[in-house]
Amino acid sequence: MDPMLDRLFFVFHTAWIAFNCLGWIWRRTRPWQLATVSLTALSWFGLGAWYGWGYCPCTDWHWQVRARLGHDDPPSYIQLLIREVTGIDLRPGLADALAVVILAGVTLLSVVLFARDRRATRATLSC
């Protein structure tokens, strides 16, 4: 069961991150992407106030599964993902900085595009 959970977490978590990073591209997915980015920020900074900054329940649960499988994982899922995909082993501080900068960038982009889309929709409806 754990090997299947490991793969499931890897697919789900990676898809969540990819959607956070790219979901703003398509107008129809922007509200959903803004919601997933907001949930991510709420986890990192809301739950993070109690469990440690950058806390992600998905990472926590995935690490529990991987520990039972005998894996010795880095502190950050981003580190694991980059290592698995590219073979590059990032330092923890660099991985954290990269994650925060990307989250801040896509959050700003999402809010600006969402507001622009809302204004355009209201302008169209008022005509």
Say what each PLM segment does.
Residues 52-95:
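Extracytosolic (periplasmic/ER-lumenal) interhelical loops and adjacent juxtamembrane/interface segments
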Residues 1-17:
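Hydrophobic transmembrane alpha-helical segments in integral membrane proteins
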Residues 15-23, 42:
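Hydrophobic, membrane-inserted alpha-helices
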Residues 24-34, 119:
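Membrane-interface helix-boundary motifs at transmembrane edges
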Residues 11, 41-50:
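Aromatic-anchored segments of alpha-helical transmembrane domains
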Residues 6, 82-117:
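Individual transmembrane alpha-helix segments
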Residues 35-38, 106-127:
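Cytoplasmic juxtamembrane regions at transmembrane-helix boundaries
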Residues 24, 47-51, 110-114:
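Structural signal for membrane-spanning alpha-helices in multi-pass inner-membrane proteins
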